[in-house]
Amino acid sequence: MSDTSENSNAEIPADTSDVKDKPKPIVRAPQFPPPPEGISKSQWKKICRKKRFEETRAEYAQIRKEKRNRAKLARREKLKEYTDRGEEIPEELKRPPKVNLNQSDSGISIILDCSFDDLMNDREIVSLSTQVTRAYSSNKRENNYAKIKVTSFDKRLKQRFDNDLSNSNYTKWKNFEFTADPTLPTENAVYLTADTEEKLDTLEPGTTYIVGGIVDKNRHKNLCYNKAKELNIPTKRLPIGEFINLAGRKVLTTSHMVQLMLRYFDNKDWKEAFESVLPPRKLEVDSTKEDSETASAE
């Protein structure tokens, strides 16, 4: 009996099988209680999601803070390794200046069309506000800047900036304007959308490029394309497939769209702009196309 007891309490050896071969757990959609009488299911889901967002806001803020602190610590340790060895610090570890004092005017204007506020949940509004601030940072730091305007700035996105991001002083941002006016130009304007077949070969000074300010995880197909068609604004797409392969969706964030256009003016080379701006996890360079596509870009 004692042997049986000892065996039952013996330490079970750890599973040494390759964890990569194990299937990932299925992430199921959150379950909400039945909606009260008089409230539709979609309205009730929005209410529940908003409530859950408010309840977990502080927790997520703490998680993001800890993640930033870990990244800072890892960077400091990496820098120390180079300095201890007396080696030059690589460019990718150097922080870019907050303001580029040697900027040139690209000659283009960019509009962030933020008229899709009602189609996003609260988390997506937070994400969009982050993308807008990143677009502003790019406009300060890149070698070329654009005149950027945020339109339809009058709902939750504005509340986000006025309440949670009030320290940003966004009303004083240089070359960056916020307006509640939803009007979009129809002359010398191009609406950029991945849903069109027309390819954007070059950026032309004097032209306004409109970017849809929406975070929707691809829920709303042809949203920007249909709006542009209704307003008789020409549509074009960045030449992503012609120069690179993207891992996953060929839909870029609003901030990446802005940074790519600004970076394009460095050498007027889309391939170089894509490879220098997009994170490696999204980028899959097709080396078989390199020679022909480089020639076509010149």
Swiss-Prot record:
EC nos: 2.1.1.221
Taxonomic source organism: Kluyveromyces lactis (strain ATCC 8585 / CBS 2359 / DSM 70799 / NBRC 1267 / NRRL Y-1140 / WM37)
Protein localization: Cytoplasm; Nucleus
Spans annotated as Disordered: 1-44
Domain of life: Eukaryota
GO MF, one annotated term: tRNA (guanosine(9)-N1)-methyltransferase activity
Keywords: Cytoplasm, Methyltransferase, Nucleus, S-adenosyl-L-methionine, Transferase, tRNA processing
Record function comment: S-adenosyl-L-methionine-dependent guanine N(1)-methyltransferase that catalyzes the formation of N(1)-methylguanine at position 9 (m1G9) in cytoplasmic tRNA.
Subunit field text: Monomer.
Record protein name field: tRNA (guanine(9)-N1)-methyltransferase
Binding site for S-adenosyl-L-methionine: L192, T193, G212, D216, K217, N218, R219, H220, C224, L238, K250, V251, L252
